[in-house]
Amino acid sequence: MSGPLEGADGGGDPRPGESFCPGGVPSPGPPQHRPCPGPSLADDTDANSNGSSGNESNGHESRGASQRSSHSSSSGNGKDSALLETTESSKSTNSQSPSPPSSSIAYSLLSASSEQDNPSTSGCSSEQSARARTQKELMTALRELKLRLPPERRGKGRSGTLATLQYALACVKQVQANQEYYQQWSLEEGEPCSMDMSTYTLEELEHITSEYTLQNQDTFSVAVSFLTGRIVYISEQAAVLLRCKRDVFRGTRFSELLAPQDVGVFYGSTAPSRLPTWGTGASAGSGLRDFTQEKSVFCRIRGGPDRDPGPRYQPFRLTPYVTKIRVSDGAPAQPCCLLIAERIHSGYEAPRIPPDKRIFTTRHTPSCLFQDVDERAAPLLGYLPQDLLGAPVLLFLHPEDRPLMLAIHKKILQLAGQPFDHSPIRFCARNGEYVTMDTSWAGFVHPWSRKVAFVLGRHKVRTAPLNEDVFTPPAPSPAPSLDTDIQELSEQIHRLLLQPVHSPSPTGLCGVGAVTSPGPLHSPGSSSDSNGGDAEGPGPPAPVTFQQICKDVHLVKHQGQQLFIESRARPQSRPRLPATGTFKAKALPCQSPDPELEAGSAPVQAPLALVPEEAERKEASSCSYQQINCLDSILRYLESCNLPSTTKRKCASSSSYTTSSASDDDRQRTGPVSVGTKKDPPSAALSGEGATPRKEPVVGGTLSPLALANKAESVVSVTSQCSFSSTIVHVGDKKPPESDIIMMEDLPGLAPGPAPSPAPSPTVAPDPAPDAYRPVGLTKAVLSLHTQKEEQAFLSRFRDLGRLRGLDSSSTAPSALGERGCHHGPAPPSRRHHCRSKAKRSRHHQNPRAEAPCYVSHPSPVPPSTPWPTPPATTPFPAVVQPYPLPVFSPRGGPQPLPPAPTSVPPAAFPAPLVTPMVALVLPNYLFPTPSSYPYGALQTPAEGPPTPASHSPSPSLPALAPSPPHRPDSPLFNSRCSSPLQLNLLQLEELPRAEGAAVAGGPGSSAGPPPPSAEAAEPEARLAEVTESSNQDALSGSSDLLELLLQEDSRSGTGSAASGSLGSGLGSGSGSGSHEGGSTSASITRSSQSSHTSKYFGSIDSSEAEAGAARGGAEPGDQVIKYVLQDPIWLLMANADQRVMMTYQVPSRDMTSVLKQDRERLRAMQKQQPRFSEDQRRELGAVHSWVRKGQLPRALDVMACVDCGSSTQDPGHPDDPLFSELDGLGLEPMEEGGGEQGSSGGGSGEGEGCEEAQGGAKASSSQDLAMEEEEEGRSSSSPALPTAGNCTS
């Protein structure tokens, strides 16, 4: 009974064995037995008799809760004595304690009721007197208990005794709960003791805490023992604030001073392990400590006069700390909870909270239950945070304002959680009056479920209540209950918020919204400052379908991508400054080079230079996720090559859509540019639909031969608004050589130039409206137009380069210089030594090799002020190519001596404005293979004299360069414009239907460009015709085989993709672009223009082959030593190397028979692991590919002609070979074995024959494909296709 008694008197705790009589004297001997039933009072108390027996009255003390004793029920003296003891003790203590009704009273009442169950047979006289005395005391206790019954529990029409007893029972339960909290503290008492805490005596503690209490008269300090829960120390201010004597608190449990509803909050917030240590930041000399920053708990502490029948609770903010206190000198220190209690005043009373600071926030669930309440609401509303948590929001609103909540939540749903202001609402304060508040609302939309997770409210008090003391208890009234309208409104709001949010509004709190308008994220905390929208009276949201949900998920992802893109673009979006200085730039041959336009003044450069940045800002959000991935892949690859950061960014994002390399363009724009020159706009015509071609080719006077450094168009196209396949197809240049080229282009003190834009198609209007190609979304028409433009630009640059190549009579195009070096403007030697690429370092020994006589522009010692003459307007070249200055450089080489160029060169010989950049890459560490018999263009063919067409001025006589080595026949593999052969394959199949119409140009002498020298034109034309006649194969065959080879190599070699893209396209460049403008032939089968069925993407392939073959004509066998110094990838070496190199340089000779034997054994071992097509799969494939049903290869793959020797002999089949029968048993289609029947021709004699052909330089293209594919697979042992691997590497 100790617990209840302690809770009752708040003072000392009587021992279980002690007895008290009404007068305070111990009761006399054993109590008398009762012979008769109890009085009529039992009627009021019998109802509760089963809740507790009288045995509890003298139960033993327990720390957790009072326990029932095991007294015998055969005698009632225990009950009688307990009844008297508890009744009298309560009478003696209730007069001195302002505590709530004592639980001992409840026990006495219950004991009295239980007495009726045990009548006694003793004498009636003594028993009646005792019973009368007990009844009298019981009635007295009930009267006192009824006086302490809170007003809100006094209901009308209810039994006062019943309500009193029910309240007493609640008090008993509260006391038991308190004991459980004491137990929690005691279990954790070891943890604070182990902490490093300072120990204070009571005097020291009083001195330290006085610093707080003296500063704030509404503050007092109290120390509560963690071991006993009793007050160890309390400051003097407590008696003043609580209006009671200080001695009342000594030995009292602190929880007894708290309001019952706040006890749990107090104990839950003061666990010793979670409290800060007092000694860490507060000491006698440390000055005041801002304890308000600590975790505070709000509680109501009992106060008022001792005799006040109704205790008055005052709100306090308690800031807890943990420390050790030594009560006396000899006593051990015990861990204590030091509380700094600060009284909370009404915000409308002095000192008042300023009107502009009367703001607080709330958060409630979709069910309209308070989830969080700002502590600033306490002085404004009179409620402590725990009073509102879990309570219905509508319960505290004015009945007339409750329907507004439904409209508010509808607007939240409509605006997708965006903050918005709403009309004022009236909120009921604790004193019963209403406070008018301006409200702002916002909702948090869960990013995955797309539902409103919770609603945030920001409230600013507009009108204060009439009664400024919001903590005044309201007038007695029945306990509030949820009205039906509150329940109905809550249910409607809950159902409303169960719907997913689908709103076209800008991004809300969850970052979801329209993709095209990524608005700023609004903070609910500042929602009053920003209106989310004015959607008034939103109707109910339309029903949501699963497709809409999926669409919104994609919107979420896309929005994140847009934010990522913008974040990357933002730091580099610096304004473009007018270019001034001595920098020489190429003409911009977008349109016909008009002398009037060229004679413009330099001051116009500033506004023009700003155009790309505007386009970048407008189109920054147009980049697709696939494009970002492509750019990141390029960045990662370049980083692996240890390239300078400027080059990495340059290659990674060269267009206005990209956001990672704007800084390079910025530096270039701010670099020096001489009068009369202008740099290329990086994004004015970045893509066909992105911008319009610039009609002003030149701004200023004459042009200098030094061209700006520009990136390859294939890199530019990475970021254009094209589809994923188109994007990747143009990503053929994620290779270090291009990066080095770009790096070598850099002039001294000048960063790389901006991204060039692809040349528009010849059929495109020269000067469309400024916004004619503004991106309006990725449509098929936009993609087709853009693709055609890039293809035409890519082919046109070869035609123009080819004409210039023929002008130099003293040099055959160097294998890697003329072919690939004609891509960017020249870089002076002072810049080149900064390139640290491994591939470039491998070319340092090639300095003697002359640079290609690329007509683009030659590095010359001519002063910068001496530019080339402006190309006349009579140049026959179609002025449809976007300007791309192309420097001449020695690939991967160090500083190269640049021969002087005459300044009197006629302009017609250098139609530079019509050239678009090409990626010219030279891969490191591998020798170039020997030439093969592929037909190549005559671009590299040394011309005896420059062409002199009637429409051209005399060609310049370029100075003879150092003798260049014989041009090596570039591998057809090296000319792909795609980074992945699989992508090329897809594009090839995609281009088949339109390949016929795509081929638009004739031979080198096509009308698309000026006729080159007769010798230059005749040889490639003758070779093309010869191959066309001899092969009798589909034009796609060569590229198909090459695609397979590229597919294998690209997946294994970091430089594999370097062989693709416009790298090799730089090789061929001249005649190929002129003769195969519409659709160049691919790989080995190089047909004439209209017989080419290859995709336009392969324009660089045949053109480079044609010129490579032409250049090979003048090569001597002794010059092959030089060509092999240039090191190419292994797969390229094997593809085109002759027998000498294959047998002596790379691979040791092996016995063909043993190799074939081993391959067969390995292949048989893998038979069970081979895939099998089920019948359903075969039917499904057959529905798409007819050749699957027929068991034959498509024409694109069914190629067995030997291109080198010109024979069309078919490789004999091997129907009798046991290996083929075994493969047939596997259920494999021909295409699964590396290219069809040829792919399976690894067994028997056919295998040896195929490999002999390859070693002799006359193997079939399909065998070449399979050989290269399987040779690489053989190294990694990752492919079962092994029979020919050994042969081809032998």
Swiss-Prot record:
Outcome after substituting residue 422 to Q: Found in a patient with Moyamoya disease; uncertain significance
Name the UniProt record assigns to this protein: Period circadian protein homolog 1
Biased composition (Basic residues): 830-847
Provenance organism: Homo sapiens (Human)
Tissue-by-tissue expression: Widely expressed. Expressed in hair follicles (at protein level). Found in heart, brain, placenta, lung, liver, skeletal muscle, pancreas, kidney, spleen, thymus, prostate, testis, ovary and small intestine. Highest level in skeletal muscle.
Biased composition (Pro residues): 25-38, 751-769, 860-874
Domain PAC, first and last residues per copy: 422-465
Amino acid composition bias (Low complexity), ranges on this chain: 48-57, 64-115, 517-533, 652-662, 950-961, 1051-1062, 1078-1095
Residue numbers spanned by region Required for phosphorylation by CSNK1E: 596-815
Region feature (CRY binding domain): 1149-1290
Effect of residue 985 to S: In a breast cancer sample; somatic mutation
